[in-house]
Amino acid sequence: MSNSPLGSGSRISHFTTESTDRGDERASFSSRAFIHTVPPSDPQRQAGRLPIKVLKMLTARGGHILHPEYLQPLPSTPVSPIELDAKKSPLALLAQTCSQIGKPDPAPSKLSAVTGSSASGDKESKSVPLKLSDIGAEDKSSFKPYSKHPDKKDQSASDKSGFRVPSAACPPFTPRTGSPGSPRTPPPPSEPKASSECTDKKEMEQCAKTAPPDGSAHGRLSTELTHSEGTAGCKSLSAAPSPTPASSSSSSSSVLGSGLVAPVSPYKPGHTVFPLPPASMSYPATLAGAYAGYPPQFLAHGVSLDPSKGSSLVGAQLSTLGCTGKSAASSPLTGASPPSVMTASLCRDPYCLSYHCASQLGAGATCAHDLKSGYPLVYPSHALHGVSPPSLPGHPLYPYGFMLPNDPLPHVCNWVSATGPCDKRFSSSEELLGHLRTHTAFPGATDKLLPGYPSSSSLAAAAMACHMHMPPTGASPGPLTLRSPHHHPLGLSSSRYHPYSKSPLPSGGAPVPMPAATGHYYSPYALYGQRLTTASALGYQ
């Protein structure tokens, strides 16, 4: 009994010593794991490490797949890494593309030599990189937007309407001389792509008709506006001047001359842009000079406005009248287009039928009173011309109130009634005012005078009468009687528009007094109030 505790005690002490030994080993192992006594430069420690590239290749999913370009043998000649990277780097491809923009195409012999050498090089070793000059024309990186491949020239000329290149199959034509109003027969617009060669006679004629004399910028506009008129190959354009320019009155394109910009009009060239009187009319010399620099495609058929030619219409009429027209260069309206001549200085009031630039038109005519022919625009026939014809009828384009500086009777009555215009002429403004009182005479008001117009200057009175769009009347105290619904005793100064003053309208809603002598024609401006009178009095038209 006494030995048992000793035995047990010795056994326990053995266990304790064994456990303490194991604890020391664990402590020493933990200290070895976290505290390295071997420096990093130790070769044994470095030999146990794996390279980072190998770790990345092992951890990547597709790293075990090797592309065939890495399995090719390296070339024997030393190659710089820039040349190795020139084919694959996007920056290198971009620099290569930018460097080749605008360069001319290499010669075909050089191209064949380059392609042959590159093909043989690919047969020998596929790992040799391509240099900048070795890339063929089919490579996308060497795309040149300003150059055309020799095989694709005909196709691109028929596909694109804006970029036309003169092809050898259809040489550029000189514009054919003919009548300006000759009808055209364009091909149907259902053909989107026409042939690029002009072989038939019809296509040759269409080439001659539709080839404009300027650069390729107007090719697209003309094709869009005329529904692809003419074939695509026939539109061979040339920026060089035409070798034989025609006369100024023969065709529309030759009037403009070589190198000038042709007017692109939405109208067909056979039609007139603005309406003109018939060809039997006579034109003054200055109008003919103004229209001489404009293409006759905008004029009526058979009308020629060249005063220098005796065979033209104007020249024949001027010679019969005994007048010599001015040259085109000395005309004050030379170079102006007909729409601007028609509308630049005209009054925009529909009831004002006078023309304000008459002095410019008539300044160069030696016998201008003979140039005027009666061509009524608004009223074809009225009783006044038959009963008492005026001494001098109006201008052909603007017959009412046409004044000339050397005219002995410069003042014209512009009164228009239901029977037609009056058109009577007077030598002084007083006579004109006295005549106008007969048109606008109210009963019992014939003794009043007109204080608004200055009686000293006859030209100023006539010009004011024209710009007021009304004949000056002696019946009303103010000059703007037809425009204003009331009468002012103070004349022109009180007829202005005052925004803060009450308008002295007739009390009780009385109707506007209608002149008895005017008949069925009365100016509608009497109902408009004072705003129109202010605008016209200040000169705003």
UniProtKB/Swiss-Prot annotation:
Locations listed in the record: Nucleus
InterPro entries tied to this protein: Elbow/Noc_ZnFinger, Tscrpt_rep_NocA-like, Znf_C2H2_type
Domain of life: Eukaryota
Primary location: nucleus
GO cellular component terms attached to this protein's record: nucleus
PANTHER family hit by this protein: ZINC FINGER PROTEIN 503 (PTHR12522:SF3), ZINC-FINGER PROTEIN NOLZ1-RELATED (PTHR12522)
Role of this protein: May function as a transcriptional repressor.
The protein, known as: Zinc finger protein 503
Lineage, opening ranks: Eukaryota, Metazoa, Chordata, Craniata, Vertebrata
